[in-house]
Swiss-Prot record:
It comes from Shigella sonnei (strain Ss046). This is tRNA uridine 5-carboxymethylaminomethyl modification enzyme MnmG. NAD(+) binds at residues 273-287. FAD binds at G13, G14, G15, H16, A17, G18, V125, S180, Q370. Belongs to the MnmG family. GO terms for biological process: tRNA methylation; tRNA wobble uridine modification.
Length: 629
């Protein structure tokens, strides 16, 4: 039977991609349905109880700048907050927080259940309704049919998921959850390229069986960082430390002597695992010269005894896992409460997607998260927000939107996936962005909130706070520019006490702030330049904008030069055999990838600068030289 009411957008899956997609589509006023096999696992952290990190924290800030959920949820659930790379430049500084799994899940569910235009329904999806190469609905396991103008797949590791512990394996979406086999079969019938990937998770340890007294502690930062531009540290729950132990030669001997029982090394697992989050058996074999590896013992929550040993993801048999755990300092008597495992699952080639993450072959069908070959909650959430936005726009007969590489890490992520594809789980790093000085955590709102407002993602409260911050930045910069001190002034001695070289000429507040030894905090304690802004976010922006003004201006020039051709559109129906002068290899690659723009085409391996020049000349001759807005 058909459900009596139609929807604008259906989201299939309630993980980090699905929840952001559902919230985004509903925020934009579209009638949205979130289908999940279990309402109690909405926002579940299937692996590491943490949000953020290098590159990942940048994505979380961007999701927040566009009105998303993840940053707000972790501010309510984070039990240890740190700034990584704090001693380095602002481009690579990143926020990371340990999470209480239960509090995080509660924060996500509360937000979903209080979001207007959003309905949540508990049923697994087994089929899609496709008519004339357009998706028009979904069918659940009990045969209930839902109609919609757009359908979003955010199914994580559930598509034909297979869990491995040693040489034993069984079907599962993750530990304790069933796989989605009928939907996997249905998707394989569609004209989509499919592959298999693998990820893994470590065993969980009973904290009561660990001797923490012999281990080093790792505390969070004070003052505590905040993820959301709308948040403050008073929202954080109780803060707790993590602990550090190490593997040793005994650990490594146990692993080496049991490799024949590893499904990875025995050839049982075919899927490729994440390069930057390898299993402990992989680390021991790949880095044979290392006699130890650092392991972080991370609490899973304030009311839980479970510890997540970050660094020993494994699919070795349970008896070997016990030996590995008990070989490490402080864990000689440790007990495992959940075994580690690896999971293989289907993913679909993201090169078959438009930059909006809509399928090139099935109109109205969108993909986000691990189904696109990514790994990580943050990567999933960012894609989820983008597909929710674009599914909503499609259902309202509006053009889709995707950020450029120069606008956001989300733009880098989507461009990498849609242009290059991936053969292993894709993780975001700051090194993937060529314009990372412009794409900092601290300015995510300055880059994206105005766009989010235009798209309908940003509410009145966030918009008012954003404009207040802009005004504070502008007012303070003008004040510092127009406040001067001379070498002969009474205040010169006070100023010179904070400088490595005394004043030799008149200097403004901005001139002084450009000096390496001067900070905004110091500057605004000096009589001529007091008081400091009470808006800490605005104060941070003032300091960064002044200190890095020259570098930022140079990078902006680079972006403008690159954008002249980057946004030149390529017709989706163009047969590149029509373009004389291109090599057969280039023609084959362009016809295979069908890039949306010159920028995308230039990043395809084997497409040379000469080929790009030929393309531009041909487009001009044909009167087809058009640039996107």
């Amino acid at each position: 039977m058909f459900y009596p009411d139609p929807f604008d957008v259906i989201i299939i899956g309630g993980g980090h991609a699905g929840t952001e997609a559902a919230m985004a589509a509903a925020r934009m006023g579209q009638q949205t349905l979130l289908l999940t096999h279990n309402i109690d696992t909405l926002g579940q952290m299937s692996c590491n109880p943490a949000i953020g990190g290098i590159g990942k924290g940048h994505l979380v800030k961007e999701v927040d700048a566009l009105g998303g959920l993840m940053a707000k949820a972790i501010d309510q659930a984070g039990i240890q907050f740190r700034i990584l790379n704090a001693s380095k430049g602002p481009a690579v500084r990143a926020t990371r927080a340990q999470a209480d799994r239960v509090l995080y899940r509660q924060a996500v569910r509360t937000a979903l259940e209080n979001q207007p235009n959003l309905m949540i329904f508990q049923q697994a999806v087994e089929d899609l309704i496709v008519e004339n190469d357009r998706v028009v609905g979904a069918v659940t396991q009990m045969g209930l049919k839902f109609r919609a103008k757009a359908v979003v797949l955010t199914v994580g590791t559930f598509l034909d998921g297979k869990i491995h512990i040693g040489l034993d394996n069984y079907s599962g979406g993750r530990a304790g959850d069933p796989p989605s086999i009928p939907l996997s079969r249905r998707l394989r019938e569609l004209p989509l390229r499919v592959g298999r990937l693998k990820t893994g998770t470590p065993p969980r340890i009973d904290a009561r069986t660990i001797d923490f007294s012999v281990l080093a502690q790792q505390h969070g930062d004070n003052p505590m960082p905040v993820f959301s531009f709308m948040g403050n540290a008073s929202q954080h729950p109780q803060q707790v430390p993590c602990y550090i132990t190490h593997t040793n030669e005994k650990t490594h001997d146990v692993i080496r002597s049991n490799l024949d029982r590893s499904p990875m090394y025995a050839g049982v697992i075919e899927g490729v695992g994440p390069r930057y989050c390898p299993s402990i058996e992989d680390k021991v074999m790949r880095f044979a010269d290392r006699n130890q590896h650092q392991i972080f013992l991370e609490p899973e929550g304030l009311t839980s005894n479970e510890i997540y040993p970050n660094g020993i993801s494994t699919s070795l048999p349970f008896d070997v896992q016990m030996q590995i755990v008990r070989s490490m300092q402080g864990m000689e008597n440790a007990k495992i409460v959940r075994p580690g495992y690896a999971i293989e699952y289907d993913f679909f080639d993201p090169r078959d997607l438009k930059p909006t993450l809509e399928s090139k072959f099935i109109q109205g069908l969108f993909f986000a998260g691990q189904i696109n070959g990514t790994t990580g909650y943050e990567e999933a959430a960012a894609q989820g927000l983008l597909v929710g936005l674009n599914a909503a726009r499609l259902s309202a007969d509006k053009e889709g939107w995707a950020p450029a590489r120069s606008q956001a890490y989300l733009g880098v992520l989507v461009d990498d996936l849609c242009t290059l594809g991936t053969k292993e789980p894709y993780r975001m790093f700051t090194s993937r962005a060529e314009y990372r000085l412009m794409l900092r955590e601290d300015n995510a709102d300055l880059r994206l909130t105005e766009i989010g407002r235009e798209l309908g993602l940003v509410d009145d409260e966030r918009w008012a706070r954003f404009n207040e911050k802009l005004e504070n930045i502008e007012r303070e910069r003008q004040r510092l520019k127009s406040t001067w001190v001379t070498p002969s002034a009474e205040a010169a001695a006070e100023v010179n006490a904070h400088l490595t070289a005394p004043l030799s000429r008149e200097a403004s507040g901005e001139d002084l702030l450009r000096r390496p030894e001067m900070t905004y905090e110091k500057l605004t304690t000096l009589t001529p330049f007091a008081p400091a802004l009470t808006d800490e976010q605005a104060a941070e922006q003032v300091e960064i904008q002044v200190k890095y003004e020259g570098y930022i201006a140079r990078q902006q020039d680079e972006i403008e030069k690159q954008l002249r051709n980057e946004n030149t559109l390529l017709p989706a129906t163009l047969d590149y055999r029509q373009v004389s002068g291109l090599s057969n290899e280039v023609i084959a690659k362009l016809n295979d990838h069908k890039p949306a723009s010159i920028g995308q085409a230039s990043r395809i391996s084997g497409v040379t600068p000469a080929a790009i020049s030929i393309l531009l000349v041909w487009l001009k001759k044909q009167g087809m030289l058009r640039r996107s807005a």
